[in-house]
């Protein structure tokens, strides 16, 4: 197999748990293909650089044929130099006694700086995935600070919610995730997200014909919305491996394309589709081809139930954006 030229992949929060579950898989070719060498450009805060050094030692010790180089730094302009992909995983976690507004502001500072650095030094075609929470709003902040880059290059991860929703539906219908098609997560990566089965099928049959409405509204939706909290309760730590898996899948789909007759959920820049306010980064059903995404047209969102759920998560995203509006250019 002839090798391509290496591409540069930046990962922030590179010594953290999600990155630890992700970097080895990127270096093995799982994200961009087995014929695509990568240079990893890893960003951490200064106090974590020693821990990062240990991760890099382990990466070296794997002797990955596709790993063409590693950069370790606490300087965003070094980490983002000429990058083709940027996975923004690092964010400020919510500490004791911290209000949501404080969390938004702390992250606004981080993602403003990263957006500016991407604007200054990244490839003009850089594909950005924000994983660090609140992911949708952090993506808006980075995007607004990168006026020279196409807003379509900035995405937020709702693939984890999408995968959770598929797994729960497969379990309920005694099928496998391979049988589930056309899942949708609308809105924010938060407990207001709307896992919508209106268009979904299981083995070609409409999902809503296979499950009862009371289960769908009363059990399924809240379970998908609150799955992250359930994992923290059970594991004593937040989901890391499943988040890393979803991040890899998000980028791989964006680059390699969606399967025929199926789609995925991605937090992407709204241009007013489905009546959602322009400029929000909102999760829509999308198809991907030739390294680009497009929002699926014509999904039926006419029911009062759908309208209400989509508006509630949009309102939360608008409120988050408004809370940091004074920090946006």
Curated annotation (Swiss-Prot):
Top-rank taxon: Bacteria
Its biological purpose: Catalyzes the reversible oxidation of malate to oxaloacetate.
EC numbers, comma separated: 1.1.1.37
Active-site residue numbers: 189
Pfam families: Ldh_1_C (PF02866), Ldh_1_N (PF00056)
Sections of the chain in a coiled coil: none
Family note: Belongs to the LDH/MDH superfamily. MDH type 2 family.
Binding-site residues for substrate, renumbered to this chain: 94, 100, 133, 164
HAMAP family for this protein: Malate_dehydrog_2 (MF_01517)
NCBIfam families: MalateDH-SF1, PRK05442.1
Binding positions (NAD(+)): 13-19, 107, 114, 131-133
BP GO terms, sorted: malate metabolic process; tricarboxylic acid cycle
Name used for this protein in its record: Malate dehydrogenase
Keywords associated with the record: NAD, Oxidoreductase, Tricarboxylic acid cycle
Source species of the chain: Psychrobacter cryohalolentis (strain ATCC BAA-1226 / DSM 17306 / VKM B-2378 / K5)
Entry-linked PANTHER family: MALATE DEHYDROGENASE (PTHR23382)
Reactions listed under catalytic activity: (S)-malate + NAD(+) = oxaloacetate + NADH + H(+)
Annotated CDD domains: MDH_chloroplast-like (cd01338)
Keyword Transmembrane recorded: no
MF GO annotations: L-malate dehydrogenase (NAD+) activity
């Amino acid at each position: 197999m002839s090798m391509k030229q290496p591409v540069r992949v930046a990962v922030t929060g590179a010594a953290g748990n999600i990155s630890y579950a992700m970097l080895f898989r990127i270096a093995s070719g799982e994200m961009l293909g087995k014929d695509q060498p990568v240079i990893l450009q890893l960003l951490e805060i200064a106090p974590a650089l020693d821990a990062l050094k240990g991760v890099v030692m382990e990466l070296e010790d794997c002797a990955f044929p596709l790993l063409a180089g590693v950069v370790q730094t606490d300087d965003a302009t070094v980490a983002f130099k000429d990058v083709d992909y940027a996975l923004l995983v690092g964010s400020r976690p919510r500490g004791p006694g911290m209000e949501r507004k404080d969390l938004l502001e702390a992250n606004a500072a981080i993602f403003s700086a990263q957006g500016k650095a991407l604007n200054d030094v990244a490839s003009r075609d850089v594909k950005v995935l924000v994983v660090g929470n609140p992911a949708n709003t952090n993506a808006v902040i980075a995007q607004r600070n990168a006026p020279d880059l196409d807003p379509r290059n900035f995405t937020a991860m709702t693939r984890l919610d999408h995968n959770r929703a598929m797994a729960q539906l497969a379990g309920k219908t005694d099928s496998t995730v391979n049988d589930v098609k056309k899942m949708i997560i609308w809105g924010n990566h938060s407990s207001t997200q709307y896992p919508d089965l209106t268009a979904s099928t299981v083995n070609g049959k409409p999902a809503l014909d296979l499950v009862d409405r009371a289960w769908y509204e009363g059990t399924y939706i809240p379970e998908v919305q609150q799955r992250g909290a359930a994992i923290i309760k059970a594991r004593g730590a937040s989901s890391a491996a499943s988040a890393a898996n979803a991040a890899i899948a998000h980028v791989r789909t964006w680059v390699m394309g969606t399967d025929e007759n199926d789609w995925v959920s991605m937090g992407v820049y709204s241009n007013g589709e489905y009546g959602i306010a322009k400029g929000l980064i909102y999760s829509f059903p999308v198809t991907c081809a030739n390294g680009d995404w497009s929002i699926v047209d014509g999904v039926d969102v006419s029911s009062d139930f759908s309208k209400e759920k989509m508006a509630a998560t949009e309102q939360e995203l608008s409120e988050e954006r408004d809370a940091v509006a004074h920090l946006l250019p």
